[in-house]
Amino acid sequence: MKRSFLKSSMLLTPLVFASPIMAQESSESIFDQAPWENEQVLELFSKAWDEGRNYPTKAEFESIGLTFDLEFVRSHSRQRATYKDASKDVVSDINHNRSLWCNLPAGYGKGLGGYPSTQFDQDVFSMWNYTSIFGSWNYGFLQAPGSWVDAAHKNGTRIYGGIKFFEGWNDDGSEGAFLKFISTKNEDGTYKYARAFVNAAAFFGCDGYNYNSEGSTWRDTDWVNFHAEVNRIAKELNIEGFGIGQYTQQPNVSDSNIGYIYGNAEKGKIFDCMLNYSGNKLAYRYVSNSLAAIEKAGLSTDDVYQGQLLVGISSDYWNEMNTETTKQMNICIWGEHDQSRFFQFRVGSSPTNVQENYQLLLEKAFSGANRNPLSRPEISNAWGSFQVADADHANEQLNNSPGFASMFAERTAIGGNLPFETHFNLGNGENYFYNGKVTNGSWYNMSMQDIVPTYRWLVTAKGDMKTFANDIDVRFTHEDAYVGGSCIRLSGATTAGNDIVLYRTALKASAGNVKVNLALKGAK
């Protein structure tokens, strides 16, 4: 007989328990975008620095209309360190140092979508374990929700605080105005707003800034030198993880453009560089020349990413992008402006079913079609349908996907000392549960997302981590929870037994002094 039970909480501890925190609710009406216009916030930080302070005062923020909504933009969560060990990676034949940049929107809708609310059916992206950088594509500078920064940082992922968007064919004057703004110099010739850029990012807790540079400013000397100075200051202040992302229409790195789009030997890396796709597909033909140009310039290839248009994930040049040469190039997936294509293409018969299928779709894209990194289809250029008509066809989505696990190593941000605790919260719920009882209605707050499982899902034969098993199905569900709004459901039957490996950790534990507490429902 098949059996199903819920795992709602797990606590690994030397007999220590930390109480959970109730979710914070808010109304969208408090998020006023007007104070962020015309670089008013950066002006405040520049004024504060001129007066000997790192940050503006409460009164100064209020003078431009930023009041209590300010705290919803701030994050107070430091980025956790990540731990990688190639000898323990599930997939062995990859470039273990290759990185994935998800240049995606955070939440649904421009400007407001990812902020805490009472809206259950919102984007709760959860594949941080393969994501090195997240782009926050649907927000202006410094407006990415603090709740999303919290979630990314818990899982060791860098996340930009928003984007400036410039298009040469749709120039409203903002590109030239912004270039003039950042080019402003002090009497001693230094850039007036460079320190403000660094201090503002530190204050709001994000890891820097992102640009869509499809105009002409990226070739301007002041543009390059200003951002080089911003990076220099951040490095001088030992601000780990700070960076500046930039996408241009350049599909490759060359001797002539490297100093504009990436960096140079004198100043080092200036931008995290997202290269363009070609014909809406991965521009794999340019990779070899790009790598050669980067090496010639004396720079590392660590921060250059070949761009990929996410809507075409199911029929891109994945074989060609995973040769011995091309796998040395990182990849940046983009898609698109107001919502992630993953979130847009979710289907379901009810809000709960939609959310469950959304997580399944993410798992197929990252862990492979079988949702187990040990059992993945071979890398190919045909991953199966990405967009389907309705919930009846959900099983067809990416049903031949090899997953990004076939290209990138998993990472864990779980280290240090015990305790380690999780309630398997995704960051939303149709109800809020506390100790298994319903205490509140629907909610959405990515700050409440727990550290996600390292593996989605590593089900193996008992005692054999090299052999996959499919007797037991594991998935997230919002139908019940112990604390928060979600848990994981295990269902199926096995006579020989299966192991389910959820996390890789680097925890320090004393022999014989570790206790595990689990909250289960429906198990016997």
Q: Where is each model-derived feature located?
A:
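Substrate-binding surface in catalytic domains of secreted glycosidases
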Residues: N212-N381
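Short carbohydrate-recognition loop motifs
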Residues: D464, N470-D499
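Bacterial Sec-dependent N-terminal signal peptides
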Residues: M1-E25
